[in-house]
Amino acid sequence: MKAIVDSYEYIIIKGLLNKCDYAASAHMKCEIKNDFLLNSLENLNYEWRDIQKFCIKNRNDNLIIVGSTGLGKTEASLLWGADNKIFYILPLRTAINAMYERIKNLVQNDYDKKVAVLHGQTDSVYLKELDNDTTVKNENEKFYEYYKNTKKLAMPITVATPDQLFDSVFKYNGYEFKMATFSYSRIIIDEIQAYSPDILAYTIYAIRLINDLGGKIAIFTATLAPFVKDLLTKKSSITSEYKFKDF
């Protein structure tokens, strides 16, 4: 029985059933489609740099990208994510809030249907956002819907801390919901060199599980310790290979 419960097929099926059940009970969508990101990026009218061209070319692969600040890693990561479900992982709330604002400005209209922020103070961020939005007619209703879609991982793009998502590696009751969602998502890990040892440990373990479940991973960092690269690329039963590039 334990072998069945721990199998990837079981995790995905149970997780998707839980996700559908949550959505039906809350009268919400299971997923809000990402059909806007590539168009928003194209509207920037930028001439893409080498790092960005590399991510476009290798969009269907798992990536490890090392590059200094100012190379355009953010745009590169979003071009890799394309019009898919995206989780953008950063280590600090300040960095997450800044990335949330950056993506929100990129996608412009109806941001509350496109990009979410997920950390310990999500409610404060949203209340402040909606309070400053003069177009909102029913602030309480708008907040509840936005917050609910965020917590149930229904948003197209979610910028989050690793602890909000990768706690699923500890296999608490109902953990399959998150892992099943990751199985069809693009996971962007930014600045992995800044993670504390404990967070780094369970992040690497989560990455390996997500990879085995079918999710895609792209890691963008200024520096990468050799032991971290070894742990990330160490083969498990069906783990896909990474394309590594140092810019």
Which stretches of residues belong to each language-model region?
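N-terminal helicase ATP-binding lobe
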Residues: 1-247
